Amino acid sequence: MIMTELRDLVGKPLKYVPTRSFVESSFFKALSDLKLNQLKLNTDTVSISGFMNHPKNLTKFQDYPILNLDFSSFELASSASSAASDENVEYKGTLLNVNTIEEFKAINKSDLLKQWGSLIYKSITEGDTTYRSVNQFFVLTFSDLKKYKFYYWFAYPSLQSQWTVKECKEAPSFEDETRKYLDTQEELEFFFAREQEEFCGLSKFLNGSKKVNEHSTFVFVDSCRHPGLYPGWQLKNFLYILARQGMREIRLFVYRYDGTSIMMKLQLDSIPNDIKFMGWERTKDDKLGPKLADLGSLIDPIQLADQAVDLNLKLMKWRISPQLNLEKVAQQKVLLLGSGTLGSYVARALMGWGVRHITFVDNGRVSYSNPVRQPLFGFNDCFSDEGLGRWKAPRAAEALKEIFPGVNSSAYNLEVPMIGHPVENEQSAKANYETLERLVDENDAIFLLMDSRESRWLPTLLGMAKNKLVINAALGFDSFLVMRHGTTTNNLGCYYCNDVVAPSDSLSDRTLDQMCTVTRPGGALMASALAVELLVSVLQHPEGAEADAKEHSFFGEVPHQIRGFLHNFSQTKLYAPKYTHCSACSQPVVDSFRSQGWDFVKNCLNDTKHLERVCGLEEVQREAERASEALLEQAAGLDLSDEEWL
């Protein structure tokens, strides 16, 4: 012990070492989650906790009391258990998070400190002298979740009482007795008394009958190792308690585990009549002001992107749509059959809604005409080592990961078996069928986005047989159709329910303008957007895919069909019931598929008449022919009767 340091304390006002905060980045991550998902626009205070190193574990570098906060600060505050241990000491805290930086700057800091300090004063007046109540901390924050900047300012409110150091010396024997007493305690006490060879808690001492005398000594367990031997800030409120009790002179033993303990005699300069508070933390430049944690450069870019993707979605729940179930949307596994114009735009819209699992299916290559209409492809995708364009599905999956690495995108270079196109290689066709069936089983929602009408038949049948949510989008030159197929329990029709013949080959013997997708470019964007929005609206409905077309949810309507027309810029919502003899979703077709599987599909691919016989369209056609013949006969009979008048 350097005697010069002891002499420097005598005859001067007692000084205290201010507390400093150390906030780990995990605390701000937890704060951003709390703000985004729970607090939203609410500015109610939140209970938190912090911790300091146990006094016996202080190092020579801890010359200031250091309050630590991390992600557990929120968890510990909400649990009944304490974080106190042989390693750390827990402190109670309160967080106030405001909504704007202007509010953070404009709030009256003096009034706020007084408001917070009054809570400590109330605890003292009610007889609660435990360190957790006497030395609470508070923090004012503003969270800029878009830029990942966090403004914060800690406060450690202290009630003012001025004391002068009259004597200062070492007390080895008292230090030994104090150590022995602390070793017997299950939980650390930071401030207690010793009277007539007996240690006791402060509240017990103050509530006892004994008066303070020359044998009374108060003990403060210090939480820092300042080279000037000044005690930590936590002592101030304990000394105020003594001053409030009318004590004018006291003996104070500042105990430190490193052997630098000192015994002081203190004298109160004046009776604290007015209640005054101090305690805003200063910056490293010793100025009053908040701190800034800019985590944008520290967070892993992929994690940063993951949080940013969800930010705008979660902001919807703050004011506009608090009931929105984003988790249900994000958990959807979506199968996109078609990776061209519609597939590209649908995938982008799905990612915008937070969907993370997207699977592409296509068997085409990127051509030079594609990139301007299909945003997942670029010029370099139009050629490869083979001299041909890259396969669309794998390239689309790669492009999604380039846009957002957190997406789980996969691809299958697969030719969907098409009705009206006889099977040429049964082994290959069956393998494609089995892969498609497995993909339908593994996914929750299926989008039909192919170029041809007949390629949608098998996915439509699979979706109905397996009761999946199927969204269909189709383009005309200046029109489009977006619809959701019915399920096994509702009465909504599918893409084929208005047909009286089975789908047939629409690709053979076509001119160039018939082979290419000749549409107004904006139609694909509109149809894709409506298709994804229809999916989300259905998911928000309590009945999901089973919802009737006329029903509403808090998120709006869930129509059956939306037909758009660009020539007059109009849209029409339509409803078409399930057709008893539909070639794709009627019960006879579904039952035949469930019982025969690939054999049924193969027979339909090879002979559309077989499908018409199963679903009943063949009989419908016969009835139509008989009705037509009857009308002709009737018309012929009328003509003969007319001749009688000639």
Curated annotation (Swiss-Prot):
The keyword Cytoplasm is annotated on this UniProt entry: yes
Keyword Zinc-finger (UniProt): no
This protein's UniProt keywords: Autophagy, Cytoplasm, Protein transport, Transport, Ubl conjugation pathway
InterPro entries: Atg7, Atg7_N, Atg7_N_1, Atg7_N_2, ThiF/MoeB/HesA, ThiF_NAD_FAD-bd, Ubiquitin-activating_enz
Compartments, record wording: Cytoplasm; Preautophagosomal structure
Active site positions: 516
Motif (GXGXXG motif): 338-343
Gene Ontology CC: cytosol; extrinsic component of phagophore assembly site membrane
Function: E1-like activating enzyme involved in the 2 ubiquitin-like systems required for cytoplasm to vacuole transport (Cvt) and autophagy. Activates ATG12 for its conjugation with ATG5 and ATG8 for its conjugation with phosphatidylethanolamine. Both systems are needed for the ATG8 association to Cvt vesicles and autophagosomes membranes. Autophagy is essential for maintenance of amino acid levels and protein synthesis under nitrogen starvation.
Assembly description: Homodimer.
Domain notes: The GxGxxG motif is important for the function, possibly through binding with ATP.
Name of the molecule in the record: Ubiquitin-like modifier-activating enzyme ATG7
Organism lineage: Eukaryota, Fungi, Dikarya, Ascomycota, Saccharomycotina
